[in-house]
Amino acid sequence: MYPSDLRLSMPRRGLLTLAGAFSLLAVTGCGSDRSSTGSTTTETASAGSFPVVIRHALGSTTIKQAPQRIVTIGQGATEALISMGVYPVGVETYAWGADKDGHLPWNREAFEKAGRPLPALFAGGEQLDVEAIAELEPDLILAPWSGLTQKQYDQLTAFCPTVAYEKSAWTTTWDGEIRMVAKALGRPSDGDKVISDLKKTLADTAAQHPHWEATTFSYIYTEGQGTLGIFRPTEQRVALISMLGLTVDPIVDTITANDGSDWALISLENADKLKDSDLIFTFHLDAATKKQVTSQKLYSSIPAIKRDSVVAPTDPQLVTAISMINPLTVPWSLPRLTDLIDQAVAKVTD
C-alpha cells in the first residue's frame, strides 16, 4: 500500500464501465444551463487565455474556456483553487483527517469564510464514484496529485475534460500542482504568486529558527513488522520540512526508490542506515499501530527513536495537513508543527 492511501480511505462504490460513463453523458448533459449560484469562480481569466492545452501522464486535455464547475480528485487541487478565488463544486471525501462530514477542516473554513456552499463529496481512490461526479455536471476535473488510473481517466473524459498528474501517480511536486491548476484556469501568473507567497511564508519561519539549519532528518513510515518506508527528498512531506531549514539526511539519497515513486522500502534489519539522522519524522494510523511499531527492537534501536527526537503527531487532521504543501494547509498547520520540531530538536542537544 502506498503511504498516501491513508489520505483516501473508506469503502467505495464500484466503478462504472466506460459505456456507463457515456450513458451518463446523455442523461446529465454536462452543457446544460445552471443557475448563477452554481458558479465556482470569483475571478475569471480573459477570453484570450483559452484554449489551454495541458499534457499529462494519461493524455492531453484541451480546456476551451474558463471553467465554471470544477471537480477535484486527490489532494491539493482544492486548496490551490481556493487560493485563486475558485471554489469547486465537488471534491473527494476523506475518512482520515476530515471532520464528521468528510470535509478537511481548512477547506471547510475557507468555504464558510467566503460564504460559499460546501462542495459535494464523492468516493475516491480505487472505487472512484464516476456516477456521482457526472451528476455534478462539471466542466473540468482536476486530479494533478492523485492515484487516478487510466481506466478511471477514460471514464471521466467520456463526459468532461480531465487533467491528471504530470508523470506518475502521487509524485507531482507541490509547486508543479499549483502551476497546473493555474494553467487550467488560464491564470498562470496567479499560480506564480501563490507559489512565491508560500515560499516566503516558509522561508520566514525558517529564519525565525536558525538553529534548525544544522539538524538532519529522515521521514519514515511503517506498516507493520519487518519493513521501514523512507520518503525521498521530492516527496511533499520531506520537501515541507526541508523548506523550513532542516537538512535531509544524506543517506536517503543512497536508498533506491520504488519504480515511479518518491518513497522506498527497506528491511528493518537495515534501520541502522538512519543512525545519523538527528530527527525522525513519522506518523501512525492509530495507537495500536504505534504500539506495534515502536515495540520492534530494531525500530527502537534507531538513535533518534531511542532519544525521542521524533516528530510523530497523532492528530489525523495535523498528520494530513503536513503531508502536503499548499496555501491552505501550511498556515493552518505551521504553528503546531514548529512547536513539535522545537521539542524534538531540544532532545538532540540535551
Predicted regions and their residues:
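Bacterial lipoprotein signal-peptidase II cleavage site
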Residues: 30-41
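Structured C-terminal subdomain patch of bacterial secreted/periplasmic proteins
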Residues: 274-350
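Basic- and aromatic-lined ligand-binding clefts that recognize polyanionic substrates
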Residues: 72, 76-81, 191-252
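Proline-aspartate-enriched helix->loop->beta-strand connector
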Residues: 137-143, 161, 276-277
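Extracytoplasmic substrate-binding proteins
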Residues: 60, 151-225, 323-350
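A short, structured surface patch at a secondary-structure boundary
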Residues: 78-130
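N-terminal secretory signal peptides
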Residues: 1-10, 14-28
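Extracytoplasmic ligand-binding site segments that recognize negatively charged/polar headgroups
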Residues: 96-102, 148-151, 167-180, 214-241, ...
